[in-house]
Amino acid sequence: MNIMSLEELEKIIKKTNLFDPYLGIIREVKDNKIIQTLKIAENHLGAPNTCHGGVLASLMDSVLGLTTWVDSVPKGFYCSTVEFKINYLNRAMLGDTIIGKGTIVHRGSSLVITEGVIYCEEKNILICKGMGTFNLYTKKD
């Protein structure tokens, strides 16, 4: 499979994924893996000093999707979320910096299954775990 380079992926992400920067998600690549971080700010809160679950779900969807992109999307293809689930295990609090990482579980011809975790390294706690299914497709103009 001819996977696109990280530079090619970054160009596509900048054109198609405008929501992550809106939330303040920062993306970096280490050892050919996507790592995403988010510092919990006041606009992320859903309860006093606690990050809203929707913010965590958005970060998880991004972690799962970009992990799929980096590992399994051939040149000329895109991927979209078919479904995903999330288990909330601990709270992320105002001021916490949380980190999201993903791994591929299954790679088929048109579907990819990815697992992810979001954790707070400073507090040594797992915030949530997720799993998603992604559809590979060619762009139709």
Where are these regions (language model features)?
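Terminal targeting signals and extreme-terminal segments of soluble enzymes
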Residues: 1-141
